[in-house]
């Protein structure tokens, strides 16, 4: 088992503290770029057989909701479908975000 040193600027896993700091800064910059790019990633869901469509971006901003006029009279169903649709949309967004973040962090792992 390889010992990792972290005192006095000595090596940590084969990299100096300066190299690790630069790597961390580079990773933070890349993560911020990806975070900013999420505003350009469009995500949508359709629930109730297409009666409700919700559109958002991966930065968690809802952009539009389309509701079939027939649902406007049945507020209970409308409410249930909106909740289901928003939850499904958020799950989709989180999956996209996790996959993109994993790609970034995987490239920076020292081992």
Swiss-Prot record:
InterPro entries: YbaB-like_sf, YbaB/EbfC
Localization of this protein: Cytoplasm, Nucleoid
Keywords recorded for this protein, A-Z: Cytoplasm, DNA-binding
SUPFAM superfamilies: YbaB-like
GO molecular function, one term: DNA binding
Keyword field contains Cytoplasm: yes
Cellular component GO terms held in the UniProt record: bacterial nucleoid; cytosol
Protein's UniProt keywords contain Metal-binding: no
Chief localisation class: cytoplasm
HAMAP family according to UniProt: DNA_YbaB_EbfC
Quaternary organization: Homodimer.
Family classification: Belongs to the YbaB/EbfC family.
Known role: Binds to DNA and alters its conformation. May be involved in regulation of gene expression, nucleoid organization and DNA protection.
Protein name: Nucleoid-associated protein Tmel_0542
Organism: Thermosipho melanesiensis (strain DSM 12029 / CIP 104789 / BI429)
């Amino acid at each position: 088992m390889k010992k990792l040193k972290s005192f006095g600027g000595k090596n940590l896993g084969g990299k100096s503290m300066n190299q690790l700091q630069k790597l961390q800064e580079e990773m933070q910059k890349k993560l911020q770029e990806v975070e900013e790019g999420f505003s350009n990633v469009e995500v949508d869901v359709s629930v109730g057989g297409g009666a409700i469509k919700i559109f958002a971006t991966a930065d968690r901003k809802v952009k539009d909701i389309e509701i079939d006029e027939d649902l406007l009279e049945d507020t209970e169903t409308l409410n249930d479908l909106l909740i289901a649709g928003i939850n499904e949309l958020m799950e989709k967004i989180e999956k996209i975000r996790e996959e993109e973040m994993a790609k970034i962090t995987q490239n920076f792992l020292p081992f």
